[in-house]
């Protein structure tokens, strides 16, 4: 499908079924979201499918599924196990969104401030300022989420970008002080046409 067609089909779909995604489809989704698309990116680091401030690659992409939570390792294009068990409900954040609690994939966007402030190469002006940091990591998250939306549209999948239980997820994932949970994104097959 062309990019223009994917853009035409891009939309938020909140009615998401519980049918599991095939492994290759999940693999392609994660690569499209935040994968390595070139070895020689800016500042002698691999480039990604979404831009980031000073190529800091400060967003960590966690994947919550029925069997556990994983961290997407873009360099090796694999999922590293983080936590066993079903924690998808934390990724949606509220009982008012229970209708997607059993969707097969819940992405969890986590910023690592250390990566943002300790990049090699060019440093964006003001990166030590917390408000400037927030503006960059929110934009960078949006770029990744946009890739997810376009991939979902191209594959006939449903996707919904939303808030999540930030405190609950941070505790379960045992995040470091310089890491922050930002948002969730639910992906699966549409439950309605």
Predicted regions and their residues:
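A glycine-rich helix N-cap at a beta->alpha junction
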Residues: 173-193
